[in-house]
Amino acid sequence: GLGDVYKRQGLLRVSESQKWEPRFLFNIPLAIQLMVFFEWYVGLQNLHLEDALIYKTKTWKQVWADAAKFRKKARRQILKDYVFFPVIAGPNALPVLAGNAIANVIRSLWSSAVIFNGHFTEDAETFEADNVENETRAEWYLRQIRGSSNFTGTDWLHILSGNLSHQIEHHLFPDMPANRYSEVAPKIK
């Protein structure tokens, strides 16, 4: 993964190695917003909105074109959760709508906690983009290990986190079924 590589400063200051700027005074409210709407931010992440907003290396027309898949998926989910299910619930439409909204926020909070705990810990290192351009395959594997962190807990925690408590193994073997991460974790350690 490239989650540990900083081409430019991100939304949040997640490491002491990132130079402090006054905009980082908003880290806490921005982090809360990111957690509540995590599913949408994940969907928008690959659009690189900062390229149009800040760096001016992309036009809004390009962003709109790049967002076609995201818009289609978002439209389907919004219609399903906030129109279809409430409508078929009839007189219970409002509780269903509220329940779907609450469930989506809870899922976003949980997902963000799992992802943040695997990527932005004291032990996880960050790397500058120019340091990884010509890295060897061995250096890539080492960066995957050094750029993420595992967290421990009960079997239920591993199940409820989709086994992403084994973030290092997830980065090393992204195609491996998640339930196998715990088998290879001792060998990686």
Range-by-range predicted roles:
Residues 1, 115-123, 165-176:
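Histidine-centered catalytic micro-motifs
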Residues 2-6:
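Short, small-residue-biased leader/transition segments that mark boundaries at the very start
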Residues 7-144, 149:
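Hydrophobic transmembrane alpha-helical segments that form the core helix bundle
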Residues 11-15, 26-33, 156-171, 179:
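Membrane-embedded and juxtamembrane structural elements of multi-pass membrane proteins
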Residues 98-101, 105, 159-188:
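C-terminal, well-structured subdomains that either form a transmembrane helix-short loop-helix hairpin
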Residues 132-163, 167, 186-189:
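Cytosolic-facing loops and C-terminal tails of multi-pass membrane proteins
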